[in-house]
Amino acid sequence: MKKTFFYLFAIFCCFAMCLVSCEKPQTGGGGEDDELEDVVLPEGTIRLQALTSQYGSGPDMGYSNASHNFLLMFATEDCEVIEGEPFGNGDILVFELFSESAENILPAEGIYPIKDMEPIEDGMIVGGFDVEMGTPFGSYIQHMENDEFVGWDLVTGGAMEIKKTKKDGVLEFYIYTINEDGTEGYYYYRGKLLIENLSAIE
């Protein structure tokens, strides 16, 4: 009887921990329930639709030690990459990010604000938000300092530089952001493209 109770209690605890670890940060402007087909985006836009919950252990629900950290983006027109097939209009891109790669960095040579939309050395900008659009197209991105999670930044604008490496579909890209408080940010990510078009697996 005691063993049965212990097993049931252990199962309950595991279930409760799973529920907690799957909790998501709230996205700006209505979040990921927005009807994509009803959203009119400017030509050349990449939409950062959502940053999903982090699954892992550690401080702050594992945000700084995430083992599975996904970034979901929505391409609104054909977008080229340096290597590999271009992203097509309407493609939904799912990246698995390397947890150690999420960095908030200072403006660097070769990275340009969205208003300039100039090419980036060794890469190319494939899209961006109109910074005047504001929070309806906002999303939360984790803010890392010295490899530690310090909070969520609400991103209301962004540009993206992306390049595909030759090995295993690993991508490196920068995201230029206009944060909720009006400050600018540059985020560097490394990750693996898992799905190029969600509709292809329906």
Where are these regions (language model features)?
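Sec-dependent bacterial lipoprotein signal peptides
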Residues: 1-21
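Bacterial Sec-dependent N-terminal signal peptides
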Residues: 15-49, 197-202
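Short, exposed beta-strand/loop patches in secreted or surface proteins that constitute
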Residues: 36-65, 158-166
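A mature extracytoplasmic/lumenal domain signature
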Residues: 52, 99-101, 166, 177-179
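Surface-exposed helix/loop patches within compact recognition domains
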Residues: 61-163
